[in-house]
A protein has these predicted regions:
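Internal, well-ordered domain-core segments that constitute the primary functional module
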Residues: 132-253
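Bacterial Sec-dependent N-terminal signal peptides
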Residues: 1-24, 515, 532
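Short loop/turn motifs that connect adjacent beta-strands in outer-membrane beta-barrel proteins
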Residues: 24-40, 81-93, 118-122, 164-178, ...
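Exposed, low-structure sequence patches enriched in small/polar residues
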Residues: 4, 223-231, 241-532
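Transmembrane beta-barrel architecture of outer-membrane proteins
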Residues: 39-43, 69-77, 108-112, 154-158, ...
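Surface-exposed loop and membrane-interface regions of Gram-negative outer-membrane beta-barrel proteins
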Residues: 87-117, 131-150
Length: 532
């Protein structure tokens, strides 16, 4: 793993002078105009539900949603896309996106506030930005398991090679992209309100993510088949975790500090104080192996993809060391023996794009299985029993931190039941062992009217630590129509439903209406650009 990310950094450095972009195809020196091409967006949304807001009216909106049966917001955003300077060797982008919500967990939401710069092919972003999912359809997929689009953006400093760069060997068949980021969670006040300081919470938690993707393929017109594969990893570390003990008392748990904590977030290592003699890894480490196969035909494009989630070595590498001695040597590595885990937990999906389709344009179908989690047993070596079995992975939860969530919404796939649904003040994912099937499709009914449909069936068993007394089921459905009056005005109406037990999502039905206006801000720089 160390070599993987060292290679990623080296490739990013090599990529800077060689990747083909617009500025490589022109000798013209573009005048710097940092105030041109500023786009605006004004948006109003209202949701009305019987029960809570249904799943697909709430999920995968970058956390800009509420479960309250009546909620809404007014939103104003200004953005200068980084792509504005694609003809220059350097680029500048920035945005401010502010929301005034009704019946949300905040009175004011700064959804996005960032500035980013590009020099040749490397990009540096500082602030909160909505990042899309990789290797999946952002409108139709149920969501990535690690770096999803379900929670509010985390303010961060992010260094990236955002677009695939062709490596200068292998005949142009290999391309690479990736990122490294550090930031800080912003939901301290929400955690205080939600738990009432009576259950576990964590303040000033630091965030780290990294990802690297390799694509094998060439010009799709000549070579229609391509493969994409990658590793996504994230970590919550530092801060001040407050943990509720078995006797009901609250204790402040020491966490890693300083440069060593940042290093252990980047290269998993160290250990938490609570690990005791059985050192694990410092912080909440997690990630996914991802892969996608693509075939590009004349009239259609097909993608088949996989997303394998892990919380530790047992699912990251599907093996763990199990060669400890006995007696006085119970904690000494004696033999080359390993415990092999099964590859059961996985997300499998397929995406079909009809290039000239109208009524039907894109179809996504996904299958998720998360029941295994390295098995129902977790045992560390002792003087009597030397076997080491690292089961009970408890996806999205953690002993010291409040799990893979931000502002109550899971950061990954929303089929893991987000803590915001809990009514007991506990910030935990209470259903992370499930099987699910998901279908999404969209199309255009006319040149102005488009639609989108999402449908999901899920069967859950709770968690290993707190299992349901029996398996529970849930079905969620959404149909959405969008009408564009002109290039500036758009109206969207969506109807969603949930059918399930209270341990899942319950019975909900709701209507969501969104009105938006977009355009180009009238500035002197924009007027000058339009005259060219």
């Amino acid at each position: 793993m160390k070599h993987l990310f060292t290679a990623l950094l080296m490739a990013w450095a090599i990529a800077i002078p060689t990747q083909a972009q617009d500025w490589l195809y022109t000798d013209e020196v573009q005048e710097a105009e940092p105030l041109n091409n500023i786009r605006y967006k004004g948006e109003m949304q209202a949701s009305f539900s019987k029960g809570q807001t249904p799943l697909w009216l709430n999920a995968n909106k970058h956390g800009l949603s509420s479960l309250d049966k009546t909620n809404g917001y007014m939103r104003v955003a200004l953005e200068r896309p980084l792509q504005t300077d694609s003809a220059r060797r350097w680029g500048l982008g920035y945005a401010l996106d502010v929301v005034a919500p009704l019946h949300y967990t905040s009175n004011v939401v700064v959804q996005q506030a960032y500035i980013e710069g590009r020099w040749l092919h490397g990009a540096l972003t500082v602030g909160s930005k909505q990042w899309p999912m990789e290797l999946k359809n952002n409108r139709l997929s149920s969501g990535s398991q690690t770096l999803g689009i379900n929670a509010r953006p985390v303010p961060q400093v992010r260094l990236a090679l955002p677009n695939y760069w062709t490596l200068p060997f292998a005949g142009g068949w290999l391309q690479l992209k990736g990122h490294i980021a550090y930031g800080m969670m912003t939901d301290d006040n929400w955690q205080h309100d939600f738990t009432g300081y009576q259950n576990s919470y964590a303040d000033r938690v630091l965030y780290h993510s990294k990802a690297g993707y390799l694509r094998i393929g060439r010009d799709e017109d000549m070579y229609p088949f391509s493969v994409e594969m990658g590793l996504e990893m994230a970590c919550e570390f530092g801060g001040t975790p407050h943990v509720k003990l078995a006797d009901g008392s609250m204790v402040e748990m020491p966490a890693g500090k300083g440069l060593s904590a940042f290093w252990h977030a980047f290269i998993p290592g160290g250990q938490d104080t609570s690990d005791g003699m059985y050192g694990n890894m410092e912080g909440n480490q997690l990630g996914s192996w991802v892969m996608r196969l693509n075939y590009n035909a004349d009239t259609w494009r097909l993608g088949v993809y996989a997303d394998h989630f892990f919380e530790d070595h047992s699912q990251m590498f599907l093996l763990d060391y199990n060669g400890y001695g006995t007696g006085e040597e119970w904690n000494v590595r004696k033999d080359r023996r390993f415990y092999v885990y099964q590859l059961k937990d996985i997300m499998l999906g397929t995406e079909l794009n009809l290039k000239y389709g109208t009524w039907l344009k894109n179809v996504v179908f996904e299958y998720l299985f998360t029941k295994y989690q390295s098995g129902p047993y977790n045992h560390d070596r002792t003087s009597n029993i030397p076997d080491h079995m690292a089961g009970l992975d408890d996806y999205y939860n953690h002993g010291n931190y409040t799990g893979w969530q931000h502002w109550g919404q899971v950061i990954g796939n929303p089929l893991y039941r987000s803590p915001i649904y809990n009514d007991n003040g506990v910030i935990r994912v209470l259903n992370n062992r499930f099987v699910a099937f998901h279908l999404g499709f969209d199309g255009d009914l006319s040149s102005r009217l488009s639609y989108r449909v999402l449908a999901t069936w899920q069967k859950g068993w709770g968690t290993y630590v707190e299992p349901f007394t029996k398996a529970h089921q849930n079905a969620s459905f959404m149909v959405e129509g969008a009408y564009r009056f002109n290039p500036q005005w758009n109206v969207t109406a969506a109807y969603g439903m949930d059918f399930g037990s209270n341990q899942m999502l319950g019975h909900n039905a709701g209507l969501q209406i969104t009105v938006s206006r977009t355009g180009l801000l009238k500035t002197k720089a924009n007027k000058k650009g339009n005259k060219r």
